[in-house]
């Protein structure tokens, strides 16, 4: 199936060292920053019993196999909070999930999270919440993703005392 964004963020969190403040002072370690480029929709398999999906998801969830169902929902920001609570910043580039008004799957599974618009709906709101202050940008189809990502990188670099590989 699609993308398990929250699972990916949890995996990143598990392999990141304890961050420093990036001051380049003796004993300090680099500040950690995670860049997330996404359309903001988790599309993952969850257990039929005991799994949870957003309360606004369209139920019943589609059956994937005998033990799982397919959950499509905006990012659950729990993993973001865990990462940020460790002192790791998160930069988010939202490649907007644009409306597909003639597509039945979109209308029945995604549209309720993308209202009133892709820039202001639940998907965008959760990604803004995931991002560290000042480190959120969005781009629509036809927009310049490279420029948006470069601008985010410049924001991160200009607010970090030193960069290390």
List where the protein language model places each region:
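P/S/T/G-enriched low-complexity
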Residues: 1-165
């Amino acid at each position: 199936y699609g993308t398990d964004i929250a699972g990916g963020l949890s995996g990143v969190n598990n392999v990141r060292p304890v961050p420093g403040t990036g001051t380049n002072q003796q004993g300090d370690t680099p500040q950690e920053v995670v860049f997330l480029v996404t359309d903001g929709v988790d599309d993952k398999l969850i257990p039929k019993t005991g799994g949870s999906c957003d309360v606004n998801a369209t139920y019943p969830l589609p059956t994937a196999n005998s033990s799982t169902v397919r959950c499509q929902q905006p990012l659950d920001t729990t993993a973001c909070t865990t990462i940020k609570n460790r002192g790791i910043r998160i930069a988010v580039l939202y490649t907007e999930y644009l409306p597909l008004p003639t597509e039945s799957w979109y209308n029945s599974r995604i549209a309720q999270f993308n209202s009133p618009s892709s820039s202001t709906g639940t998907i965008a709101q959760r990604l803004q919440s995931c991002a560290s202050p000042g480190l959120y940008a969005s781009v629509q189809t036809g927009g310049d993703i490279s420029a948006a990502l470069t601008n985010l990188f410049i924001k991160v670099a200009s607010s970090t005392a030193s960069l290390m590989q």
